């Protein structure tokens, strides 16, 4: 029932958070860094997923939304193969359908005009 907002690079904040404290993390329409030479700037990286796994409670959710298919493939490839996360999708409609309890952003509204919208959800294993 508590909420905190951090208006800066979350990667700086993650190491300071208490392990197992967070129930849900949203990454909504982050910069896809489409040029290959910039992929190291993407938020979803192995070390970032390690930090998310550390702070998420067992059964906690990491939700990722994008309108960039390359970015979606990148995040899916890393998170689905991470030992601490399980992709929750049961079928194609699961990743095409926005979460019922989601929060729209201005970038999502912009993305709705395009052909691609991807909503990925990963559950923290354990517990």
What are these regions (language model features)?
Residues 1-23:
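S-adenosyl-L-methionine
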Residues 22-43:
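A short SAM/SAH-binding and catalytic strip from SAM-dependent methyltransferases
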Residues 34-36, 71-74:
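Short catalytic/ligand-binding loop motif for oxyanion handling, primarily in non-cytosolic enzymes
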Residues 42-61:
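A short glycine-rich, Lys/Arg-flanked "PGG" loop and its adjoining helix->strand segment in the class I
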Residues 71, 77, 81-127:
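Class I S-adenosyl-L-methionine
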């Amino acid at each position: 029932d508590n909420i905190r907002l951090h208006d800066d690079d979350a990667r700086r904040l993650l190491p300071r958070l208490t392990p197992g404290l967070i129930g849900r993390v949203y990454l909504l329409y982050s910069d896809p860094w489409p040029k290959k030479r910039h992929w190291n700037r993407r938020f979803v990286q192995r070390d970032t997923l390690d930090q998310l796994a550390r702070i998420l409670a067992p059964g906690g959710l990491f939700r990722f939304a994008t309108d960039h298919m390359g970015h979606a493939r990148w995040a899916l490839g890393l998170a689905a193969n991470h030992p601490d996360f399980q992709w929750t999708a049961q079928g194609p409609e699961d990743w095409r359908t926005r979460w019922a309890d989601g929060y729209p952003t201005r970038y999502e509204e912009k993305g709705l005009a395009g052909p691609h919208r991807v909503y990925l959800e990963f559950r923290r294993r354990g517990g």
